[in-house]
């Protein structure tokens, strides 16, 4: 309940400070696995989340939080970030650089709380968006680099499908996944409602007998989630 109140308080503060070039989102749903850097951090949990983006002159600043509600085993994950996209080749591709700091609060789940710093470079274009990202977790003493690609494709009747693939090399494991997300935005007078679903194939060689920051090893497992998002 305490973390739910924190989310509500955060949303209220974001709503008060929002203005032009800003948007706020609220979402709720369910996932069978919550993924952090290619490994499972929670299993079979409903979730709620809030987020806000403010576009400033030199960067987009964003803040968000997700609560995985599971009684005494709840978790929360909080991210503060900033990013900037610049045009590299007009009408061909651009470059976007993001830096983030994320706090992982595992509650009583048995996974240590930790703080993670990340950076991501993407090359958005009309065909496919490749990216490379890296992170360092100061509490888990883990660093890793991930490379991937994704593409958002409009479909008939307002649907958008986004396939993606990613491979990562972390100090104590490797991870790979291929996933597909489907959304259908509905514009209303007070915001955009977006139902969303996603499913993916995940594999890694994480050793749960040696390390305690994931719940299991993936061996070609299917990970899925679904929910509803409101953006205003």
Region spans (language model):
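Short loop/turn motifs that connect adjacent beta-strands in outer-membrane beta-barrel proteins
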Residues: 18-23, 55-60, 87-96, 109, ...
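Short glycine/proline- and aromatic-enriched beta-strand/turn motifs that initiate or cap beta-hairpins
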Residues: 18-70
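Membrane-embedded beta-strand positions of outer-membrane beta-barrel proteins
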Residues: 26-28, 61-65, 97-101, 119, ...
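Transmembrane beta-strands of outer-membrane beta-barrel pores
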Residues: 30-36, 56-58, 65-71, 86, ...
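Outer membrane beta-barrel transmembrane domains
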Residues: 157-212
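Outer-membrane beta-barrel "beta-signal"
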Residues: 180-182, 186, 218-232
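Residues that define the transmembrane beta-barrel architecture of outer-membrane proteins
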Residues: 22, 42-48, 74-78, 111-117, ...
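Cleavable N-terminal export/targeting peptides
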Residues: 1-25, 231-232
């Amino acid at each position: 309940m305490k973390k739910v109140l924190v989310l509500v308080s955060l949303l209220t503060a974001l709503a008060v400070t929002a203005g032009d070039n800003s948007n706020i989102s609220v979402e709720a749903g369910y996932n069978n696995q919550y993924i952090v850097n290619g490994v499972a951090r929670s299993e079979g949990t409903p979730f709620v989340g809030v987020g806000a983006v403010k576009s400033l002159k030199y960067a987009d600043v964003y803040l968000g939080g997700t609560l995985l509600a599971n009684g005494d085993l709840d978790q929360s994950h909080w991210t503060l970030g900033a990013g900037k996209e610049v045009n590299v080749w007009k009408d061909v591709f651009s470059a976007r650089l993001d830096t983030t700091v994320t706090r992982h609060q595992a509650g009583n789940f048995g996974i240590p709380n930790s703080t993670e710093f990340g950076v991501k470079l993407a090359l958005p274009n009309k065909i496919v968006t490749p990216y490379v990202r890296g992170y360092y977790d100061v509490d888990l003493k883990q660093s890793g680099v991930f490379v991937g690609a994704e593409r958002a494709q409009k479909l008939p009747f307002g649907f958008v499908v986004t396939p993606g693939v990613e491979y990562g090399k972390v100090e104590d494991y490797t991870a790979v996944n291929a996933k597909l997300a489907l959304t259908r935005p509905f514009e209303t007078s007070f915001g955009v409602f977006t139902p969303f679903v996603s499913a993916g194939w995940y594999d890694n060689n994480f050793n749960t007998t040696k390390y305690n920051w994931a719940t299991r090893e993936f061996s070609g497992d299917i990970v899925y989630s679904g929910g509803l998002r409101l953006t205003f």
